[in-house]
Regions:
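Conserved alpha/beta catalytic core and glycan-binding cleft of carbohydrate-active enzymes
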Residues: 46-48, 234-236, 248-282
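Residue-level detector of short, conserved catalytic/binding motifs and their immediate flanks
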Residues: 22, 140, 279
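Short alpha-helical segments and helix-capping/turn motifs at coil-helix boundaries
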Residues: 8, 106-108, 267-268
Length: 282
């Protein structure tokens, strides 16, 4: 790879194609060698594998123009929100893990939501994550829809179908912490690039790395990911997870306010509202 004048490394391949897998190999200053996924990649292998792969985000063509033009934040309207974990909502006997893909489950979910008068579906995090038991709250691929349930195009189809049936779609988003798995963000270049150095605020109560929101690398990644899901997948809102743990040091009000994180959250919200004025930020 070539190091650009502003510090970013780049590589151009004329032979690269959609579906091709890749990893980053990083050599630290001390000479250690690590392999990582692409935290900005649009697709990752099904766990326990973790290579990133090239995705064509223009493959699916949305047909929800009318919905997107007319939607609003619903702050002054009654909402009936159904929270869904896609992996356990309905068992698929034809799949060894019991999962339906995004396309297969769409009509089943929509039928259920309409029957019970739900106005919105709220999905537990759909970004890629290594552990099923985390329900998606410990991320490694912040721009990658989890491959457990199919492809990016299939997720777009699910959202599109919901909109055609006048059902809004919200996704849980995790801006506070990330998975400790070695191929992810943790000590990405051999230093504490996205997280805190070892301290009593470095590891969360869930055993994950807390984001250090004072660093520009972290701010860029998290706010870009939030914008990505709203822009590319037409989600109608994001529910920010574990915000109390971000506002206060260690989630403890007695320890005071984490001003860096509060500043980040304010700036991210302002930016998202400018770009997506009708999206809900919860």
């Amino acid at each position: 790879m070539t190091q650009e004048s502003y510090g970013v490394y780049s590589f151009v391949s004329d032979s690269a194609d959609f579906g091709d897998m890749y990893k980053y190999v990083i050599y630290t200053k001390s000479g250690e060698r690590f392999e990582h996924c692409d935290p900005y990649g649009f697709g990752m292998e099904l766990r326990p594998q973790w290579a990133s792969y090239i995705v064509d985000l223009s493959e699916y063509k949305f047909t929800d123009d009318k919905w997107m033009e007319c939607r609003n934040k619903n702050y002054n309207s009654p909402m009936n929100i159904y929270e869904v974990h896609l992996g356990s909502w309905l068992n698929n006997p034809q799949n060894e893990n019991g999962w339906y893909n995004y396309s297969e489950i769409a009509d089943k979910l929509i039928q259920y939501a309409k029957k019970h008068k739900y106005t919105h579906l709220e999905f537990l995090p759909l970004s890629e994550h290594p552990a099923d038991c985390s329900w998606g709250y410990q991320n490694t691929g912040f721009f990658s829809p989890t491959s457990r349930y199919g492809t990016a195009a299939q997720l777009m189809e699910l959202v599109d179908k919901c909109h055609k049936n006048n059902i809004g779609v919200i996704m849980d988003f995790v801006p506070v912490h990330f998975a400790v798995d070695g191929y992810g963000l943790a000590q990405y270049d051999g230093s504490y690039l996205y997280e805190y150095p070892p301290s009593d605020v470095g590891i969360s109560e869930w055993g994950t790395c807390n984001f250090n929101h004072s660093r520009n690398e972290t701010r860029c990644l998290v706010q870009s990911a939030a914008n990505f899901w709203l822009e590319k997948f037409h989600f109608d809102g994001l529910r920010m997870d574990a915000i109390s743990r971000a506002i206060y040091w260690g989630g403890d009000p007695a320890r005071g306010v984490n001003e860096n994180t509060v500043s980040f959250l304010k700036n991210m919200n302002l930016g998202l509202q400018k770009l997506h004025p009708t999206a809900m930020l919860i």
